Each structure stands twice: as structure tokens, then as C-alpha cells.
């Protein structure tokens, strides 16, 4: 019976490892996904303060999150099993249209009861409620625009190759249809990039600026990074970035000079500039009379960022342990915008370093996958999404450690926020699906790589054998 039980265990273990070996996507990315989700479940369960949840107890909260995790894993699995890159490429063409339409509804503050309603939350227009579901527009825009630019850069390259061969291009038909007429200049490479890349980026950032200045700057930086990954001319990118920065500074200057009378729709510009100049120091309270209105206004302003700094400081090397956080009772949204501070408080510097290594590993693995992709769209999509996820993670960490301006960026796949979590699951699903294309080449190179110290291994073993013989004498 014991032997049969052992054989059954060995058979089960064999099937498990065979299943692992047969996973076609990048295994390192899979490990990163599951590690981030594990941190998310543990951290959200522990960070949920019963004092803050009111009508919900902790188990209700964690059950909701586990359900979202299940849906997210389902999205990842569904996208992972799409084996044709053309499906992603076709859908990516709609990225700018989807972003523009959602931002338009948000910026116009559309309210059609029961259908779609723009929502004003925490002093900003950020979300749409569609048929009862809350959609965080900026999260969709980030991923959609990265994928759109991946398509545009791929389409431009294919278009130029077709024209060099004197063949009819099936891409960028709008510009090509202008060839030979008064608008012939639109068929030139610079104007094609301007129409399909630079103008969509500019429009998107301006529309995001109406709701969040910091998000507009962050999204603009990520999209410029995607252009660099795709090989767009550095000179043109520099000009486009300078134009965008000049436009932003002009809006900020006019808004501040006229006290908001010019460009009143950009009310978040004032918030953005205030956050860049803000000083979240407890010493600011010393010159105010305790109990006064000004005292409590200043206290409310610094409470969350200052408590996040306290959480990081009190975490030490190993942290307070699961459930040991005290700052979760002070920071109302610690499981969202201040998740990294909470993790460091409970898991210490060790936990913080693990989180950092996971995101850095994702960026490194994304770069490796991209370098092995033969398809231009696949390379840019994986590289762009990896930069987006890692960039947002580090932006979140900078806010939590008071080394960057205040923004509302969550920690990807860890922070609470059902819609943001699902959007990043889509991003990971695309990365894993595309990694199938590069897996065989990566595996072949890893297998071919010589082990470290291969030449010395036999010498070491021979020395050990001699020592063993001496002991036996």
C-alpha cells in the first residue's frame, strides 16, 4: 500500500511538472503575475480597516477582491489562448477611437441616467458609470493608446516597405489617397507619422489634462517611450515633445495668470501645479493655532502623504508582520494609492525590495521577449506594455516615499480597484499571448548557453574525489 501511494504521488507530481513544462507562454512572466496577485490578496485583506468599511466587514471585502482576481485570471487565460497576433493588431487600430470617445464623454460631463454618466470623484472627473459599472477612463486610455501606437508604428513600416517595392500599400490609406493632389504632402513619411501618431498623442494628452494634469504628463511620457521603442526618428520625437511641453506650460501660465478665467475647463492644472509645489511636512502645522479651521485644513492636506511616510519608516527591515499596520486606520485609501507604503510597513524593506524586483524583472523579461519577436507590432506592444506597467509601479512608489509629486497612480495588479486591476490583466494577457511567438527562440538560446564554470566543474569534482580517498587511508 505504501509503495502504491508513493507511485501515485510521483505520478501526480509528474503530471504537474509536465503541465508546467508545456506552458507555452513565458514562465517568468507567469510567475510575476501570480506573485503580484498573491501580494494583492494578502495586502488587501490585511489593509482593510473595519473602521473605514462601515457596512462591509473584512470577509465581504476580500471575497469581492477574490472574485475580481478570478475574473482577471479568466481574462489573462482568454487572451493567452489567442494564437493569432493579427487579432490584437486589428483591435489595436481602435485604440485611439475608443480613447477619444471615452474622454469626450468624460470631458463633456455627459449624464444620461441609466446609460452613461460622467462622475466627479475626489475633486476630478475620472470615471464613467455605464449601465451601473464604474469605468476608470484613464486606465483604459493608457493600455489602448500603447496598443494603438504599436499598430501605427507597425503599419508605417509595412507601408514604407510596400511603397519601396512599388506595391499598393494596404495601410495608411487616408494619407496615400492624397498622393498626386493638392494634399500630396500628406503622403510623405513625416506627415504620415504626424497624422497617425503625433496628433493622436497630442489630442489624447490634452483631453486627459482636463481631468488630471499628472495623468496627462504620465501618459504623454509613456507614449513617447513607445515611439522610441518603435524606432520613430528621435528628432521628430523631440520636436513633438517640445510642442507638447510648450502647450502645457502655456495653458498653466494663462490659467494661473488669469486665476482660471482663461481655459476654465483645465481646472486640474491648478491642482497639478500645487502638487508639484506642495510641502507635506508636519512642521507646517506649528505656526497654526490648534483647533482652528486653517489647522484642520492643513492637517487634512498632509495627513495621507505624511502617514504614508510614517508607514515606510516604521516598517524597518522585516516589517510589523501581517495585520500589524497602524497607518491603515489613518490613511483611508491605503489599499489603493498608498499600497506600497502599507506593504513596506507590514513586510519591511525586504517586502518592498521583492515588489521592486518583480516589476524590474517584468521590464527585463519584456525587453527579452520583444528582442526575440520577428513581428514589429508584437515587439512594440510587449515593450510598450512592459514600460507602462513598470513605469506606473515606480510612479506609485515615488509618491509613497515622497520622492515624486502626488498622483493617483495605483500599484499594477496589487492595489485595490476592480477596473484598474482588470485593465492590467488585459495588458498581462497580451504580453503572455505574444510571448508564445518568442518562446521557442528564447528557449533555444537558453539551452545553448553554457553553464557558468563548466570548465572548472570536473576539476572541482576530481579534487573532492582525491580528498575522499585521503580520508579513507
Q: PLM ranges: what are they?
A:
Residues 217, 223-236, 326-351, 408-421:
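Interfacial segments of multi-pass membrane proteins
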Residues 188-196, 240, 329, 380-388:
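Alpha-helical transmembrane segments of multi-pass membrane proteins, especially transporters
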Residues 2-29, 42-43, 49-211, 397-412, ...:
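Membrane-helix boundary/helix-loop-helix interface segments in multi-pass membrane proteins
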Residues 121, 125-127, 240-351, 376-377:
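Hydrophobic, glycine- and aromatic-enriched re-entrant/interface helices and adjoining loop segments
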Residues 70-73, 93-100, 193-209, 213-264:
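Hydrophobic alpha-helical segments of polytopic membrane proteins
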Residues 67-72, 141-142, 346-363, 424-427:
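Hydrophobic alpha-helical transmembrane segments
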Residues 367-408, 414:
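Loop-to-helix entry and N-terminal half of a specific, functionally important transmembrane alpha helix
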Residues 148, 249, 253, 271, ...:
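Transmembrane alpha-helix boundary/anchor motif
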Amino acid at each position: 500500500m505504501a509503495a502504491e501511494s508513493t507511485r501515485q504521488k510521483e505520478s501526480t507530481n509528474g503530471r504537474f511538472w509536465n503541465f508546467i513544462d508545456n506552458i507555452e507562454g513565458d514562465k517568468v512572466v507567469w510567475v510575476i503575475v501570480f506573485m503580484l496577485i498573491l501580494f494583492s490578496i494578502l495586502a488587501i485583506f490585511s489593509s482593510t480597516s473595519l473602521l473605514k468599511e462601515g457596512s462591509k466587514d473584512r470577509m465581504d471585502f476580500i471575497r469581492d477582491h477574490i472574485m475580481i482576481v478570478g475574473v482577471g485570471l479568466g481574462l489573462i487565460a482568454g487572451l493567452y489562448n489567442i494564437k493569432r497576433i493579427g487579432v490584437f493588431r486589428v483591435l489595436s487600430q481602435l485604440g485611439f477611437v475608443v480613447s477619444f470617445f471615452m474622454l469626450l464623454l468624460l470631458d463633456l460631463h455627459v449624464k444620461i441616467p441609466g446609460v452613461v454618466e460622467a462622475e466627479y470623484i475626489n475633486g476630478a472627473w475620472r470615471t464613467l458609470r455605464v449601465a451601473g459599472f464604474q469605468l476608470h477612463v484613464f486606465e483604459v486610455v493608457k493600455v489602448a493608446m500603447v496598443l494603438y501606437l504599436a499598430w501605427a508604428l507597425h503599419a508605417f513600416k509595412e507601408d514604407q516597405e510596400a511603397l519601396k517595392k512599388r506595391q499598393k500599400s494596404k495601410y495608411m490609406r487616408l494619407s496615400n489617397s492624397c498622393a498626386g493632389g493638392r494634399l500630396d504632402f500628406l503622403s510623405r513619411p513625416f506627415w504620415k507619422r504626424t497624422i497617425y501618431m503625433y496628433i493622436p498623442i497630442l489630442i489624447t494628452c490634452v483631453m486627459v489634462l482636463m481631468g488630471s494634469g499628472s495623468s496627462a504628463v504620465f501618459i504623454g511620457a509613456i507614449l513617447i517611450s513607445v515611439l522610441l521603442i518603435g524606432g520613430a526618428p528621435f528628432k521628430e520625437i523631440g520636436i513633438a515633445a517640445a510642442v507638447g511641453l510648450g502647450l502645457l506650460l502655456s495653458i498653466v501660465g494663462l490659467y494661473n495668470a488669469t486665476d482660471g478665467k482663461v481655459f476654465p475647463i483645465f481646472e486640474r492644472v491648478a491642482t497639478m501645479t500645487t502638487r508639484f509645489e506642495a510641502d507635506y511636512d508636519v512642521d507646517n502645522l506649528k505656526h497654526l493655532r490648534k483647533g482652528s479651521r486653517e489647522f484642520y485644513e492643513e492637517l487634512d492636506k498632509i495627513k495621507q502623504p505624511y502617514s504614508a511616510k510614517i508607514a515606510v519608516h516604521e516598517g524597518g527591515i522585516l516589517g510589523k508582520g501581517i495585520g500589524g499596520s497602524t497607518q491603515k486606520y489613518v490613511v483611508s485609501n491605503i489599499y489603493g494609492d498608498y499600497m506600497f507604503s502599507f506593504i513596506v510597513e507590514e513586510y519591511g524593506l525586504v517586502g518592498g525590495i521583492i515588489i521592486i524586483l518583480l516589476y524590474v524583472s517584468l521590464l527585463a523579461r519584456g525587453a527579452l521577449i520583444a528582442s526575440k519577436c520577428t513581428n514589429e507590432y508584437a515587439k512594440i506592444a510587449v515593450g510598450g506594455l512592459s514600460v507602462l506597467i513598470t513605469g506606473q509601479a515606480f510612479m506609485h512608489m515615488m509618491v509613497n516615499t515622497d520622492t515624486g509629486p502626488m498622483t493617483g497612480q495605483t500599484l499594477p495588479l496589487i492595489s485595490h480597484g476592480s477596473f484598474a486591476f482588470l485593465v492590467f490583466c488585459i495588458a498581462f494577457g497580451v504580453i503572455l499571448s505574444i510571448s508564445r511567438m518568442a518562446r521557442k527562440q528564447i528557449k533555444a538560446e537558453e539551452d545553448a548557453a553554457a553553464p557558468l564554470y563548466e570548465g572548472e566543474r570536473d576539476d572541482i569534482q576530481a579534487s573532492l574525489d582525491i580528498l575522499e580517498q585521503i580520508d579513507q587511508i
